[in-house]
Amino acid sequence: MDRHTHLEGSLAPDWVRLEAARRHLSVPDLTEAFWRGEAHSFEAFIATFVFACGFLTSSEAVAVALGAAVKRLPPPEPGLPRGIDLWISPHWLVKERRQISLAHLWKGLEQGIETARCQGVRVAVVIDAVNHFGPAHGHEVLDLVLGERPSWVVGFSTGGMEKVPFREWAPVFERARKAGLRLAAHAGENGPASRIREAILEAGVQRIVHAVRAVEEPSILELLAERQIPVDVCLTSNHALVPGLDHHPLPGFLAAGIRCGLGTDDPGVMLCDLPGEWQRAMGTGISPEAAQRLQEQSAEDAWCFQIGT
């Protein structure tokens, strides 16, 4: 169960290279260096993400990206559910970059979801807005998607830089909630631990992504545990946020009774898959009992199994 992956970060490098060649484009040296593991800067990550995302210009490409996410799941195993909670940024693709229409984005997702369903994989879609663009942007995102929202669009989230307090975003989250969407937020990723508290108490967020800064305030760990707020953990993606696996807060989260699930985040950019994330999780030193609990909660709290298609 991949609890957190972004459509825009899912295209496989080989597909991107082929598509670039078809369009007579060269893959930037910085992007190739990042894929080879020779470049590690945030600038290299962004350059790679933006270049690959630039090929999401048709419904077929969108379906390919979702298919790539499905391929990164573990192989089928009796008794283990397979699913993806998929984050997408339609406003960025449709309005800001103007590289695909909303109709073609929905069509590609519908095709990809149907193909996944035939493979026994359930998919739910979460709409992502950008915190540092502010609440007005959040309302624009909802304006775009709520009019003809497919049934598999089940959630609303914010990402980006955590510069705007969640109390300012509260009306946007409330509008999304009233429209029937579940609420999530990237918090405690690049912002202070207090952003996690704000997201939960002031914006009504039901699920937190990353939350690596939560360990800085024991009261926030207690809040997450007491309210049973699920946390999406993306170990490879978090490599720039913690010194190493032995410093990742996942073991502390589980020991504190926090419900967690594993995700790949931007697997086509970071070159990771879910089996690899499980290996990294075990590398943090969690016990077999904690690993079993992590596996169970990854599925139990996944929106694709609760209300997804």
Can you annotate each of these PLM segments?
Residues 186:
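Short HxH-centered metal-ligating active-site micro-motif
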Residues 1-181, 190-195, 202-203, 207, ...:
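Metal-cofactor-binding active-site regions of metalloenzymes
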